[in-house]
Amino acid sequence: MRLSSPWFFLLLNAAIFQLGWWSLILFANQALVFALLLLCVQLLLVNPGYRSALMADNAGDEHSQLAGQNVKRTGYSMKTFNAVLIPAVIGIALDAMLHLGGVFEFDSPSRLLPLWLCCLWGHFAATLGVSLAWLRDLPKWQQALFGAVGGAGSYLAAFRLEAVAWPLGQSATFSLLILIWSLLLPLLSYCNLRLEWGANRPTKGFL
């Protein structure tokens, strides 16, 4: 697959997220430095300008390469950074409340949310505008369905891998997470879209 293909960035974004997810779930804070380095790569790749520039550089067309160099000179878009930061902060705040409320328990005796989980939220937020951008084109009820299945399912996997404990029991906690994520994923997808593009959203896709 060529670097000039949009699919390259979509698959790379998804692969880095999976690598970050597994490393943080399995090794927690021991994998934090590695996961933060991966997150830095994600923050670069989520910028549409840099993606377009890299695609242009590898297109083999002189005009496209000149256009790519011009895009690089414009620098990093803070809109893109905020489109990752704000959804991540929303997710961190929500998990922190669930932790304080006794829904989640972690190995650390601290009532603060573990750093590895905060980093994981950064990784997830970085997928909203790239490998999960297709959610934007779905009706809200379908976004809610994907949130209920994928979001709650991710927490269930973390529970099964003993990254988190559920003091309230598996059935009650999983039901609560299904409800939360059926509302949360549409909200986060909308926030990411509005923060990055404002009223000038792309008609389809993630570029």
Question: What kind of feature is each model-predicted range?
Answer:
Residues 1-61, 65, 72-207:
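Aromatic-rich, lipid-facing transmembrane alpha helices and their immediate juxtamembrane interface loops
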